Amino acid sequence: MNLQKRILVVDDEPDFASIVQGNLEKEGFAVDVAYNGVEGLQKVQANPPDAIVLDVMMPEKDGYIVCRELKEDDKYCNIPIILLTAVASHVTSTRYTHADGMATEADDYIAKPASAEEITKSIKKLLDLS
């Protein structure tokens, strides 16, 4: 029986997604990648992962909308979601805030630049693997 945990990384920056994917695979996770919110939702519906790393600012559907849709769906509401955003550290008011992230019922919220190690640590904690 395969007990390997599956992680979906949804980020429109291929280089960042690749770094996170590589780090997670080194830690023994199976990783799938999507490059926008619509593709991410399709991958969740086709094969639900054990956890999701979800960028906030993406084309087609942003991470807040994707997170909200998943948390409101009984089939997917228990999948841990980590939201990532580059705007959390901005002093000026933006359309994306930490409070917005937590309002989506995300399980964790990490500001970019986030290290792949920080993301891996959060996933392990959320999946009770730490």
Task: Report the location of each language-model feature.
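Non-catalytic signal-transmission and effector/linker regions of two-component phosphorelay proteins
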Residues: 1-6, 117-130
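Charged docking surfaces used in two-component/phosphorelay signaling
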Residues: 18-26
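Helix N-cap/capping motif at the beta->alpha junctions
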Residues: 33-42, 63
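Short amphipathic alpha-helix used as the core "switch/output" element in two-component signaling
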Residues: 42, 64-77
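Active-site beta3 strand of CheY-like receiver
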Residues: 47-53
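Active-site residues of response regulator receiver
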Residues: 55, 85
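Receiver (REC) domain active-site loop signature in two-component systems and cognate sites
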Residues: 58
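Alpha4 helix (beta4-alpha4-beta5 surface) of REC/receiver domains from two-component response regulators
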Residues: 65, 88-110, 117-121
